[in-house]
Amino acid sequence: RIDMIFGRKAKQAEYIVDVHCHILPGIDDGSRSIEETLKMLRIAADEGITHVIATPHYKLEHNNATPGQVDELIDAVQAEASKNNIPIVIYQGNEVLFFNEFDEYLENKSFCRMNYGDYVLTEFLPTDRFSYIRNAVDDVLSTGCVPIVAHVERYECMASNIENVRTIRNMGADIQINASSVTGGGGKNVKKFVHSLLKEQLVDYIGTDAHRCEGSRVPNIRECSNILYKKYDEKYVDSILYGNAMDRIIQ
């Protein structure tokens, strides 16, 4: 058999939830048009993605879209996707760059929780100190929400010390890494770090963080999925590709 000669064939997930994607057109630095959005969705579907949480950037003192505007765009994109027979369901979210008034803006519903629930995709600057991120996680948790720390591998204080990731996860934060980091797109050191997280089962979600329909920031996840199923426990991989997102966010 071919799989005996060349190694075990990777399982294909029945569902894949992309929890981090800049798919909505003209709203941030992601897709620039509905045409590009549809191309991104076609790529995502071909990669096995079945559900996408749209996570446009939300940054204090920027010209951010309101949750209502995000909803309107999602409805329009979903209609176009259906019209073009692209079998993907899109949900509301934001990628929120943490700021000190987070709780006030959350209470005022200024930005989107993930699918109207209790999870918020939360971003930091690469050079933010661990004490700042730890305090931010505590602040978000105090609101009753759970921070999903976006692309944790980008933060110097995390990538230099896996125990810092363990600490914020033990506090109650969830951890997201990018699919491209698993395959080496972020470089050797990043790849080594995310695989150390995966070995310790410190990752809760995989996202593409896609911004474009071509180049290096497209919604590719199949190569990542194949690697995960070959290297790690199948039930754990199921959970980070779709199970956790289905249970905690999409429900």
Model region roles, listed by residue range:
Residues R1-I86:
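An N-terminally biased module of ancient metal coordination in phosphate/nucleic-acid-related enzymes
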Residues M4, R222, N226-Q251:
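Mid-to-C-terminal alpha-helical segments outside catalytic/metal-binding sites
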Residues G7, N63-Q176:
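Extended substrate/RNA-proximal surfaces in nucleic-acid metabolism proteins
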Residues R8-G26, I162-Q176, T183:
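Mobile, glycine- and charge-enriched loop segments
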Residues E14-D18, V52, Y119, P147, ...:
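Hydrophobic "anchor" residues on beta-strands that sit immediately upstream
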Residues H22-L24, H57-Y58, G93-L97, L125-T127, ...:
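Active-site beta-loop-alpha junctions enriched in small/polar residues
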Residues A45, L141, R169, L198-K199:
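Non-catalytic positions within long, well-ordered alpha-helices that form the structural scaffold/packing
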Residues L202-V218:
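Short acidic/histidine-rich active-site segments
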